[in-house]
Amino acid sequence: IEELIKNNIQFDWTIMEESGKASGNELISPLLLSHRRLMIGDHKQLPPFSETVVNSILERDSIDYSLLIDGISNGSFKTNLTRISGLDELSELMQSDELDNDTIKQLNQTIKRIFTKTKTHFSLFKHLVETSERLNINNSSSMGDLLKIQYRMHPNISKLISSLFYKDQLINHKETENKYLDITTKPFIFSTNDHFPNINSDKGIVWLGIQDPNKYNFLPQEKDYTNEFEAQIIIKSLELIQSKSQLNAENNKPIKLMVLSPYKKQVDMLNSLFLTHKTVEKIQQKGFCIAQGDNLCKTVDSFQGGEADLIILSLVRHNTHTPIRKALGFLLDARRMNVMLSRAKYQMIIVGSLDMLAWWSNDSRAKDSEEFLVKMTNMLIPNSIQAKELEICHYIPIAYQNN
């Protein structure tokens, strides 16, 4: 791209995918290659790299101007930037005896405005989408729109995603919806046993629920961002799964399967266990294939843009430590949860403690600040009014077994 810009090469169109994951700095170069630009992405999924770090710096209440000036004047940005930005004048002002409280106050206000613009430019795609949405509301000419029709997933899954993240705006493609609602088209089944009664549900979401950590007498299974009990459940479920190609020779297309977890340590542990149990070889013999790459388990971040016929999720977190962000961590990151919950086509099996999420969602601190968590729990927890109305999730309680 650098060479194209240097040689003043122009195209009729520039099309950029995954624009929501790119920072404004990364988008500038391709934007310069044409006067017509199409940006495709989802700002409600994974953000640009280091967005959280950048925002934490820009949102600080106090500013150390000496560090700011030194970093730009003497750091890797040195050249003409100091002169053309006016930082040389700011440096002289900071070292003079004329710096009074009014000047500092005015300086702070100016810097805050600059930082606000910097945040906007760093998360450029998000800013453009939100601007477009405001224009649509005001019936003004808009520069963008939401792609509302979804073709990928079971309508139960899309209902959850649409309600949690997209203001109930997603629409299921009719033929796709009918295909997923017809359980005979699902290309896999499970051999039932006492571990997972009624696991062959027609629901697009199945939750294998570990009991509430407040209600048992053994130590929590979560340890250092791993959860061995969840891993045992996943191993067992993969032993029981069968492809319908084994039962029907006409259907011999490999079924894509993937296990996801928010935490790298859990991913590493699961992949190690899969090697020990020869899980990949066994599922391949039964007509399944890994949806992406060589490892059956991946982190959520590494699977954005991916999809599989069946997704199994390991949530890991299983405690009631305070504060809430220490207890739930990743599970409170709505954008990453959006990615995790929207990868499955036919079915998503979630392994984790829904009781724990319900416990937290009933906590006043969560109700005040964690709307996403409360809403998701109410849609999925058995016996809640909303869950009974929606009927999108089949819940199977799993009793702890100390193997």
Regions found by a protein language model. Name each.
Residues 1-12, 232-236:
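Conserved helicase/translocase P-loop NTPase motor core
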Residues 240-258, 265-342, 354-360:
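Conserved helicase C-terminal RecA-like lobe
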Residues 53-142, 320-403:
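Helicase C-terminal subdomain and adjacent C-terminal extension
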Residues 8-23, 38-39:
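SF2 helicase catalytic motif II
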Residues 20-21, 44-45, 301:
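Catalytic acidic motif of RecA-like/P-loop NTPases
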